[in-house]
């Protein structure tokens, strides 16, 4: 994959992000604590949600390959690992008690990776069941938010720390029903967390990507990104101190579409007006 690095943003070739014209400040205008803009994984203690497979498993392996001293590999029912540096940890991000137990068990974390997510079988938001809507809201939005809030004191207590939120290109493309809606909400939360945690030295990174070659995307015949390539791109960005990762052309194009007329993004709306 060809990648070009711009100020505080990593995109695949052809992207056109515009650097922010102002430095991030906290909720009350406090300037960020002076820390290095580099965030090496060497020696880090990492917690990965949704670590049992797919992207989560790759984050576990790649963090260790970059020198992480320990990785908490979390899931509702965590799998076993053949590496003493990997600590299986039960965590249900939709359960407040489970979140608090994880904070207590993993109070040495320096990098939090919000990777766990849910999807739906059909895209129509009006046809989703109540259970599908609640599951996506709790897993894709409230869970990562509550986990970030719970771990914020742990991360701010460290000399250097980072948080990585895995969004989706569907954050900017509303054809995925409740999945798109919850990923858009998480994107907004990540932006808020970044501003509030920057003054405390916590670097918050948002990741956008289209389909990735995992079981969650098995239904799609569209091109898919290899999890290895995705995680490599993300961790390169984290170590470079970047704020946002647009991991594929789909993400680049959809973000650019935010400033386009809505009929250009959704041609069916233009047809309905004719």
Name what the model sees in each region:
Residues 119-134:
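Conserved mid-core segment of classical short-chain dehydrogenase/reductases
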Residues 83-95:
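Rossmann-fold cofactor-recognition segment
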Residues 206, 214, 218-260:
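C-terminal helical subdomain
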Residues 52, 56, 60:
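N-terminal Rossmann NAD(P)H-binding glycine-rich loop of SDR-like oxidoreductase domains
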Residues 148-149, 191:
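A short, exposed helix-loop element centered on a Lys and neighboring polar residues
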Residues 108-109, 155-167, 199-203:
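Active-site loop of short-chain dehydrogenase/reductase
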Residues 148, 182-183:
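Active-site helix of classical SDR
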